[in-house]
């Protein structure tokens, strides 16, 4: 059993129980919460925990939950689960403090690896991995077009919208996006968004 607890926040009981069962079978200590409000009331007592929350919930969304945790100065590594293509909301969650986001549907290994990465924040700040000065230096290597594409990605725009706005083909957007990922040494889209925000680079 892990020495930290995974807190699952989802308003749908079958989803909550299914995820909890899978994680328990893989050696994680788990606690379930039926709503963002329920977890927020419990959060001050959390010690050594990782939060996995659904993004879209009634009454209080995952983004609002993260913002409330921030207002309360409660620092818990958080992962948000989003619907496919819900990148704009996921980006808002990253700005609110999430360390990762995962799109549905996902394989068990994807959420397990995300939780293990998030748990590393319990012992080491991410700044140790991606120094802000290094990130700004990488941003300086981007071409003007690459910076435009990155800005659109951080804004949560899909490739087709970026292509339309910049008057280029979707394939060209994919090429620029791949170049940005390589120059920024980003392991994934969430990692790229985190670095861009840490480097002070937001949507134009």
From Swiss-Prot:
Domain Response regulatory positions: 5-119
Record carries keyword Chaperone: no
Binding site for Mg(2+): 10-11, 54, 56
Family matches, as Gene3D superfamilies: 3.40.50.2300, Winged helix-like DNA-binding domain superfamily/Winged helix DNA-binding domain (1.10.10.10)
Predominant place of localization: cytoplasm
Record domain HTH luxR-type: where: 135-200
Function summary: FixJ, when activated by FixL, induces the expression of both nifA, required for activation of classical nif and fix genes, and fixK, required for FixN activation.
Protein name: Transcriptional regulatory protein FixJ
């Amino acid at each position: 059993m892990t020495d930290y607890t995974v807190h699952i926040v989802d308003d749908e009981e079958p989803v909550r129980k299914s995820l909890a069962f899978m994680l328990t079978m893989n050696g994680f200590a788990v606690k379930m919460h039926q709503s963002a409000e329920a977890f927020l009331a419990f959060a001050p007592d959390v010690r050594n925990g990782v939060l996995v929350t659904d993004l879209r919930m009634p009454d209080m969304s995952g983004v609002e939950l993260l913002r409330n945790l921030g207002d309360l100065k409660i620092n818990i590594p958080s992962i948000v689960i989003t619907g496919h293509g819900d990148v704009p909301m996921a980006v808002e969650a990253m700005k609110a403090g999430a360390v990762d986001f995962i799109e549905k549907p996902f394989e068990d290994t994807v959420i397990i690896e995300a939780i293990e990465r998030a748990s590393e924040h319990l012992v080491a700040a991410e700044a140790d991995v991606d120094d802000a000065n290094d990130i700004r230096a990488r941003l300086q290597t981007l071409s003007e077009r690459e910076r435009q594409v990155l800005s659109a990605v951080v804004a949560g725009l899909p490739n087709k919208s970026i292509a339309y706005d910049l008057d280029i083909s979707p394939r060209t957007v994919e090429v620029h996006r791949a170049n940005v990922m390589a120059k920024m040494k980003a392991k994934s889209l969430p990692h790229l968004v985190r670095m861009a925000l840490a480097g002070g680079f937001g949507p134009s």
